[in-house]
Amino acid sequence: MDKTVSSPEQAVAGIGNGAVLMIGGFGGSGAPVELVHALVDRYVATGSPTDLTVVNNNAGNGRVGIAAMIDAGMVVRMVCSFPRSSDPRAFTEKYLASEIDLELVPQGTLAERIRAAGAGIPAFYTPTSYGTELAEGKPVAEFDGKKYVQERWLQADVAIIKAELADAHGNLTYRHAARNFSPLMCMAAGVSIVQARKVVAPGDIDPEHVVTPGIFVDAVLEVPEPLQEEELVRSGEAYR
């Protein structure tokens, strides 16, 4: 099955109001900027999608990517580990104005909650956060004399990620740190949308090099020269 699409707009066209989105990227590394900005374009033009929940390692940086979504008013809730990046102005402004909610999750717990969803595990126990505000209201159990906090899986309607290579069937490879949470997000989401630097024919990727099998991918867009979020932030650029 050919999963390629011809434009960022086509790729994100099915994302609706109130969706939970997992967006790949660790800081700016591996951020799918073109897909995210296509989603902002659609919101600016139509007012949709809105009331989004975004799951990412951080809450955006500068005025691009996730920060552009927050700036536009599309996002009502962030689930992340680091809400304060090197330039957190977009999230900070909305949060102080009570226009966005935050669920703060320790980074290892965030990754494991996403992984658990992909593996079909509804809950697990971790010692992380026990005795802190982050554990308030959560079940606690004792194993071998040590207290553990119960955490629930973290599912999403859509994952939006960036890959290095993809074939038309959706099999993916990644480049270095750009891999980050992306493989887990593809497994935890109902629909996965991918931008890849290069799309090749089925069979051109060595099966031993495939990180995300195509069964977890629904749409693939080739972006030969992707924008680098960190470069945009350092240069002070903003979403259009």
Regions found by a protein language model. Name each.
Residues 1-240:
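Conserved alpha/beta enzyme-core scaffold
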